[in-house]
Regions:
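Short, Lys/Arg-enriched alpha-helical recognition elements, typified by the DNA-recognition helix
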Residues: 1-28
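Conserved tyrosine-mediated DNA breakage-rejoining catalytic core shared by Y-recombinases
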Residues: 44-53, 57-59, 95-136
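C-terminal catalytic core of tyrosine-transesterase DNA break-rejoin enzymes
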Residues: 81, 85, 91-92, 170, ...
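Catalytic-site neighborhood detector that most strongly recognizes the C-terminal catalytic loop/helix
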Residues: 47, 54, 115-119, 209-234
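DNA/chromatin major-groove-contacting recognition/catalytic segments
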Residues: 66, 122-125, 132, 136, ...
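Basic, Lys/Arg- and aromatic-enriched nucleic-acid-binding interface segment
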Residues: 10-18, 31-90, 94, 198
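Short, polar N-cap/turn motifs at the start of nucleic acid-interacting alpha helices
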Residues: 100-107, 178-179, 199-219, 230
């Protein structure tokens, strides 16, 4: 692990995957009698949990009501907010088609799709902000702009991730947000501020995000612990 980290410069999560694969190969060789001992029998590698970056409710509201100067910034903000309120990754946003939008008899809209990264199916209901953005881009006049590809057959006119990243920096400054906005933060914001902090169980969040394993969603466990701590603090304040 030290070699992979300090010599090869791999990230903790990558090291964890590499070691898991190596342990599997060595264990099979040992079980097949090709090795006298399994050197990895009692070896475990625990990767450091990455720090999760997400927006608070206050920052989300600043983003919604803030004024931006350019049309492309307005579109990029819409795309970012849609991801905040659905948990979609940038890749899944770009490939979202109308066939993946389902409306129930009571008028609610749902996204039923498959994650591009993991090929895992996921379903998520459109909250009012996401629904309003969807309706905005169903109007043909809002779909066409020389800075955004037409993206035929898709729901949104999505620009490149690099171009959107540059826009997000300007948007943050104009909306009074000090954090360095990146599109992966939108997905984290959905998981934390909009889901876990509103009492949605971790297992349900995992399904909405399209995670292949529930363990992947454990990166948000620290936020869950923070929620518990805040709840206990409120009880202590009430009791006096």
């Amino acid at each position: 692990a030290a070699y992979l980290k300090h010599v090869k410069g791999l990230a903790d999560t990558t090291i964890s995957v590499e070691i898991k694969s190596l342990k599997h190969i060595v264990k099979k060789a040992f079980n097949d009698g090709q090795m006298e001992k399994n050197p990895f029998a009692y070896y475990y590698y625990f990767a450091d949990q990455p720090e999760i970056e997400y927006l608070t409710e206050e920052e989300i509201n600043k983003l919604i009501i803030g004024k931006v100067k350019q049309q492309r910034q307005d579109r990029t903000r819409d795309m970012f907010l849609f991801c905040c309120f659905t948990g979609l990754s940038y890749a899944d946003l770009a490939k979202l088609s109308y066939e993946e939008l389902k409306q129930t008899p009571n008028g609610a809209w749902w996204i039923s799709s498959i994650r591009q990264k993991t090929k895992v199916p996921f379903t998520v209901k459109l909250l009012p902000v996401a629904k309003a953005i969807l309706e905005k881009y169903r109007i043909p006049a809002n779909r066409f702009n020389r800075l955004f590809p037409e993206n035929p057959g898709k729901v949104f006119p999505v620009a490149s991730l690099k171009s959107s990243g540059v826009c997000l920096k300007h948007i943050a400054r104009q909306c009074g947000i000090t954090k360095n906005l990146k599109f992966h933060m939108a997905r984290h914001t959905f998981a934390t501020t909009l889901s876990l902090m509103n009492g949605i169980p971790l297992e349900t969040v995992s399904k909405m995000l399209g995670h292949k394993y529930t363990t992947t969603t454990q990166i948000y466990a620290k936020v869950t612990n923070q929620m518990i701590d805040n709840a206990i603090s409120r009880i202590e304040d009430q009791i006096g």
